Curated annotation (Swiss-Prot):
Source species: Lactococcus lactis subsp. cremoris (strain MG1363)
Modification after translation: Carboxylation is probably crucial for Mg(2+) binding and, consequently, for the gamma-phosphate positioning of ATP.
One of the GO biological process terms: peptidoglycan biosynthetic process
Signal peptide range in chain numbering: none
EC category name: ligase
Keyword Ribosomal protein assigned: no
Protein name: UDP-N-acetylmuramyl-tripeptide synthetase
Length: 483
C-alpha cells in the first residue's frame, strides 16, 4: 500500500509534480486521505483502489472513460471524472513510485547489470551460473531469452528490460522467493524510456558497442544509442568494461572522473585471455587461470572473462567462477545439432551485424566444406541491421544464403529480404517460410565438413507479425525434424 500523500511527496522531491486536477480545480495538496493498494498501467488489471499510469504515445482519453481506478498519473490532463496527478515525466514517476510501493527491493538484492550490443544474454547466463555456485542457487535472472524469479522455474521474457513497475514487482517477488542476487540485462531502450530510473546496480558491465537499434522508433543516431547504454556507468557502484570496444576512451575518462571502482579486460589490459583453443581458454590478471565453457568462439570467452570479473566483485571465488562457467548452458546461443550425414547445424540468436560476423567466423574456422546461412531481419525496428547483414554476407563469399522471415511485424518480409540482398553483389536464395528454409538448407549438406547457421531467433517459439506474437515451431525443433 502507498498513500497519495507519499506519492505527491516522491514526485515533488524529484521535481516531477505539477498539480492534482479534479473537476476543473487544481490542487498542490489533496485535502483527503487516499490509499492505493495496487499500481498498474494496464487498464485490464485496474481496480477501484489502483493508482493508474497513463503512459505511451498511443494512449487515448477514451481509455480512462470507464476505467476503474482511484487516481491516474499522466503528463496530460484528459479532463475526465477520474482525478489526475499531473507530472512532467510519467515514466520517471512510475519508476520511483513503484520502488516505494514495493519497499525498495533493489536495495535488498545484490544486483549485476549487463549492457552491450551483443553477448548480454550469454553473459547473463554465465553470471547466474557462477553466482549460483556461490549462493546455492539463489540467483534471479532477467534476460532477453528467459526470466526466473526463484532460480528454477523459467518463463519467456517480454522485453530485454521490463517496464519499471514490472521490474520492481519482479525484484520483490525474487526476494519473497528467497533470492539473494539478481542478474539482468539493461538495454539502451531501458534508459531511453526510464525503465531503470532511480536504480543503482552493485556491478555494471559494458561488453561492446556497434551500430544497432538505429532507426525511427528506437535511436535516431549511434551517439544516442551509445549515450543511453553509457548511463549504466554512473548508475553502478563497480564497473567492468571491454577495453577493446569502440569509443572506449570516453568510458575510461568518465569512470576516472566519477571515481567509480572498475576493472578493464582486453588484449592490452591487465585482465586478458592469453591462450584460446576450442572450448578452453587461459586468462591472466585478477582472475587468472584455466577455464572451459560450452560455447565456441573467442567472443564467448571474452564474455566469460567479463562475467568472471563482475562476479568476483560480488564475492565469487575462483572455484565458483570456474565451475559456474563450465556448467553454464545458454538457450538459443550456438546450440549445436548434428545431421545424419555428420553436418553441424548451429542455432543462434545472432540478430545484428556484429554478432552475426562473430558467429560466421567461428563456424568458418571449424568447417572446411559448404556453409549455409538461414537469415532474416526484424520489421519496424533496427532497420540498420539489414545493411550490416548484407555486408557480413558480402564479406564471407563461402556463405550460401537463404533469406527468410524473422519478426517481420508490420513490414513485408520479402521487402526486408530484398533490402538485405541489395547490399550483396552475388545471388542469394529466398524462402520466406522459415521452417521450409531450414529444411532446404539442411537438405543441401553432404558430410561433416558442411555446416548450417540458423540465425536471429535463437530459442524463440514465436514470430512477430502485425504487432502480435504468432506461434512458431522454433528453429531448433524445426531443424530436428529434418536431420
Amino acid at each position: 500500500m502507498i498513500k497519495l500523500e507519499q506519492v505527491v511527496e516522491i514526485l515533488k522531491k524529484d521535481n516531477n509534480f505539477r498539480e492534482i486536477s479534479s473537476a476543473g480545480e487544481y490542487y498542490f495538496n489533496w485535502p483527503k486521505e487516499v490509499n492505493f493498494d495496487q499500481l498498474s498501467y494496464d487498464s485490464r488489471k485496474s481496480t477501484k483502489d489502483t493508482l493508474f499510469f497513463a503512459k505511451g504515445l498511443n494512449f487515448k482519453k477514451e481509455y480512462l472513460t470507464d476505467l476503474e481506478a482511484a487516481f491516474y498519473v499522466s503528463e496530460f490532463d484528459y479532463e475526465v471524472a477520474l482525478p489526475a496527478i499531473i507530472v512532467t515525466d510519467v515514466k520517471r514517476a512510475m519508476a520511483l513510485i513503484a520502488a516505494n510501493f514495493y519497499e525498495f527491493p533493489q536495495n535488498k538484492l545484490k544486483t549485476l547489470a549487463l549492457t552491450g550490443t551483443k553477448g548480454k544474454t550469454t553473459s547473463a547466463y554465465f553470471a547466474k551460473a557462477i553466482l549460483d555456485k556461490m549462493n546455492g542457487g539463489k540467483t534471479a535472472l532477467l534476460s532477453t531469452a528467459q526470466t526466473t524469479l526463484d532460480g528454477q522455474n523459467y518463463f519467456k521474457s517480454e522485453l530485454t528490460t521490463p517496464e519499471s513497475l514490472d521490474l520492481l514487482e519482479m525484484m520483490a517477488k525474487a526476494l519473497e522467493n528467497g533470492m539473494t542476487h539478481l542478474v539482468m540485462e539493461v538495454s539502451s531502450q531501458a534508459y531511453k524510456t526510464e525503465r531503470v530510473y532511480g536504480l543503482t546496480f552493485d556491478v555494471g558491465v559494458f561488453l561492446n558497442i556497434s551500430p544497432d537499434h538505429i532507426g525511427p522508433v528506437e535511436h535516431p543516431t549511434l551517439e544516442d544509442y551509445f549515450y543511453c547504454k553509457r548511463q549504466l556507468l554512473k548508475n553502478s557502484r563497480y564497473f567492468v568494461a571491454n577495453a577493446e570496444m569502440n569509443h572506449f576512451a570516453i568510458i575510461k575518462e568518465e569512470l576516472n572522473e566519477r571515481k567509480i571502482p572498475h576493472a578493464f579486460y582486453g588484449a592490452d589490459s591487465e585482465n586478458k585471455i592469453i591462450e584460446s583453443k576450442g572450448l578452453h581458454f587461459v586468462t591472466d590478471g585478477s582472475v587468472s587461470g584455466e577455464f572451459d565453457i560450452r560455447l565456441l568462439g573467442r567472443f564467448n570467452q571474452e564474455n566469460a572473462l567479463a562475467t568472471a570479473l563482475a562476479t568476483k566483485a560480488l564475492g565469487a571465488s575462483f572455484e565458483n567462477i570456474r565451475q559456474g562457467l563450465a556448467s553454464a548452458i545458454v538457450p538459443g546461443r550456438m546450440e549445436l545439432l548434428t545431421a545424419k550425414n555428420g553436418a553441424h547445424i548451429y542455432i543462434d540468436y545472432a540478430h545484428n551485424g556484429l554478432s552475426l560476423e562473430n558467429l560466421v567466423e567461428v563456424v568458418e574456422d571449424h568447417h572446411a566444406g559448404q556453409l549455409f546461412l538461414v537469415l532474416g531481419s526484424t520489421g519496424n525496428k533496427g532497420e540498420s541491421r539489414r545493411k550490416d547483414f548484407g555486408q557480413v554476407i558480402e564479406n564471407h563469399p563461402r556463405l550460401n544464403v537463404i533469406l527468410t522471415t524473422d519478426d517481420s511485424n508490420r513490414e513485408n518480409p520479402k521487402t526486408i529480404a530484398d533490402e538485405i540482398a541489395s547490399f550483396v553483389s552475388r545471388e542469394l536464395d529466398f524462402e520466406l517460410d522459415r521452417e521450409f528454409a531450414i529444411k532446404k538448407a539442411i537438405s543441401k549438406t553432404q558430410n561433416s565438413d558442411d555446416a548450417v547457421i540458423i540465425a536471429g531467433k535463437g530459442a524463440d517459439m514465436f514470430q512477430l507479425k502485425d504487432g502480435k506474437r504468432e506461434p512458431y515451431i522454433g528453429d531448433s525443433p524445426a531443424a530436428q525434424k529434418y536431420l
